[in-house]
């Protein structure tokens, strides 16, 4: 929307023969968010428009989900890019240390739609009642912080903490995992998510090796 408002033309495919800048956000064709792969871009450069500039945005890694193939794949996909953009310095350092060959590396932090995710109608804790704690995740991987969330859920079994705090989890949870003392809400997005987040006073995240999740930004 920003680019369109600035007068630029935007396309989500490689059908045009005069694309100035190609942005790769997800080179894996198995991903639902992938419009084209790095191989598609490579063919475009070779047969259609060699002058197009390729920017590769990296926001994923093996470390966050204990996988062993993502980093190598992204490093290979990155070889056709003119510019690499990372969502955090932590992720940039990780890929540089693992041998990514890009010489142009920048960090651009992610952001949320401030028309939706803001402090409007948010009421801070006035200490008169329980402190309402919340977190949310779309992914259900254990590394999202479920070691922390399960401990918090366990704390709520005691009268001491049950009188002081509440915990709300919005999103998906791992298979064969369940909360006993936590309010569980199905995944939400947009205004519905923002409304529910504002019903609480403290946001926490226990996500491990997170390049830059959207959850804490929202």
Q: Which ranges hold each PLM region?
A:
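A short, active-site helix/loop in glycosyltransferases that binds the activated sugar's phosphate group
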Residues: 79-105, 112-116
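Nucleotide-activated donor-binding/catalytic signature segment of Leloir-type glycosyltransferases, i.e.
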Residues: 171-202
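Glycosyltransferase donor-sugar binding loop
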Residues: 136-137, 147-151, 161-179
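Short glycine/serine-rich donor-binding loops of glycosyltransferases
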Residues: 213-217
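Conserved donor-binding/catalytic core segment of Leloir-type glycosyltransferases
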Residues: 123-144, 150-154
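Extended catalytic core of nucleotide-activated donor transferases of GT-like folds
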Residues: 11-80, 90
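Aromatic "clamp/platform" in nucleotide-sugar-dependent glycosyltransferases that forms part
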Residues: 208
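Acidic anion/phosphate-binding donor-loop and adjacent secondary structure
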Residues: 66-68, 96, 111-130
């Amino acid at each position: 929307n920003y680019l369109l408002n600035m007068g630029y033309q935007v396309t989500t495919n490689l059908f045009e023969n005069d694309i100035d800048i190609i942005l790769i956000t997800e080179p894996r064709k198995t991903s639902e968010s992938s419009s084209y792969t790095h191989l598609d871009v490579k063919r475009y450069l070779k047969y259609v428009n060699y002058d197009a500039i390729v920017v590769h945005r990296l926001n994923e890694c093996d470390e966050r989900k204990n996988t062993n193939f993502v980093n190598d794949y992204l490093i290979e996909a990155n070889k056709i890019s003119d510019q690499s953009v990372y969502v955090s310095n932590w992720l940039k350092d990780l890929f540089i240390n693992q041998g990514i060959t890009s010489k142009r590396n920048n960090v651009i932090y992610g952001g949320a739609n401030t028309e939706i995710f803001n402090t409007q109608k948010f009421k801070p804790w006035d200490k008169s009642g329980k402190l309402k704690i919340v977190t949310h995740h779309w992914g259900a991987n254990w590394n999202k912080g479920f070691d922390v969330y399960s401990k918090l859920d366990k704390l709520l079994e005691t009268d001491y903490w049950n009188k002081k705090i509440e915990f709300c989890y919005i999103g998906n949870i791992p298979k064969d995992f369940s909360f006993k003392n936590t309010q569980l809400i199905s995944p939400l997005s947009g205004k519905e998510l923002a409304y529910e987040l504002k019903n609480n006073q403290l946001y926490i995240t226990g996500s491990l090796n997170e390049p830059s999740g959207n959850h804490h930004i929202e």
